Amino acid sequence: LMLDLNRQGPHALVAGTTGSGKSVLLQSWCLALASMNGPEHLNFVFLDFKGGSAFRKLERLPHTVGSVCDLDLAHAVRALRALEAELTRREQLSAAVHASDIRDMVNPPPRLIVVIDEFHALKDQLPDYVNRLVRIASLGRSLGMYLIACTQNPMGQVSADMKANMSVSICLRVRDRLQSCELLGDGRAADLSPAMPGAAF
């Protein structure tokens, strides 16, 4: 599987029920990106809303500039505010050199990928902060900020404004055909075998 977030994205929505291989997919994806890009060119921020276990191994990467979980909501709030501040900083950097895209800058800041596991939990616990992510989804591409939002249940979790900017959808095994239809437009992801974790459309 070859996937270029810059060309095919800029943002991605990943869905899969427990045991579908979602966490392993995320880890493999991030490791592949890290192996092809040095930390001076690519950074990660991880927001883990299922107890902090999903990205523990990735926290040691030199690319990782932030990692928070739902066990410390105050820390998560600070991280979301910091992401919004970083978006504003990049807007100012681009404006200062009259660049419409950070690729046009002589010394652009590293690409920043924000990976959110259990997006539905973030939405439930910090609903007032979801709009900050919508702004990143709307403006992030030209500023080098990307979102990978993951959830067990994709039904109604992402607003229309946010979904409009999420060009990449990956659906592993989900619980029912309605959830599959939400992401794919048909029910085939509900028919994936539990014996094949990692299989996806």
List where the protein language model places each region.
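Conserved AAA+ ATPase small/helical "lid" subdomain
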Residues: 191-201
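P-loop NTPase catalytic phosphate-binding loop
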Residues: 1-193
